[in-house]
A protein has these predicted regions:
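Short, glycine-/Ser/Thr-/acidic-enriched flexible segments
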Residues: 60, 93-94, 111-114
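A short secondary-structure junction signal
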Residues: 18-21, 29-38, 43-44, 64-68
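Conserved metal-binding segment of the jelly-roll/cupin
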Residues: 80-101
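Surface-exposed beta-loop interaction hotspot
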Residues: 1-33
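Short, conserved beta-strand element in jelly-roll/cupin
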Residues: 22-25, 45-72, 80, 88, ...
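Short beta-strand His + acidic residue motifs that chelate non-heme Fe in jelly-roll/DSBH
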Residues: 36, 55, 65-67, 95-100, ...
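Double-stranded beta-helix
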Residues: 1-14, 107-131
Length: 131
């Protein structure tokens, strides 16, 4: 699994509440994977941040997939995202997949009550990190 990250406005930079990250996911790979969330104010384990994804797909006629879901299933949406689409992530896990043949770029903007990015992996998929 491959992705390239550029922290534009990390926690260490001066700002009031925003965190900004660019991510390039080459075709055939996943990002925000294993699925993670940051919707609970439970520091130091997890911070509460809403997030937006602004997607760019190359070539532009392509698509990618994004799923946003919660542990209790109250939110479970899987979207085919296209070039210039925006996805709002108010809560929950939010993995992104770039299918073969289509590179994916996205701009993440996150904000919350505390400007700290601590995420929690989905326990069902945590085994991937431990391999």
């Amino acid at each position: 699994n491959t992705r390239h990250i550029c922290n534009i406005l990390p926690e260490t930079a001066y700002a009031d509440s925003l965190l900004v990250v660019e991510v390039l996911t080459p075709n055939g790979n996943w990002s925000s994977y294993p699925p993670h969330k940051h919707d609970s104010d439970n520091l130091p384990e997890e911070s509460s941040l809403e997030e937006t994804y602004y997607h760019r797909v190359n070539p532009p006629q392509g698509f990618a997939f994004q799923r946003v879901y919660t542990d209790d299933g109250s939110l479970d949406e899987t979207m085919a995202v296209q070039d210039h689409d925006v996805v709002m992530v108010p809560r929950g896990y939010h993995p992104v997949g770039a299918p073969h043949g289509y590179d994916l770029y996205y701009l993440n903007v996150m904000a919350g009550p505390k400007r700290i990015w601590k995420f929690h992996n989905d326990p069902q998929h945590e085994w991937m990190v431990k391999q």
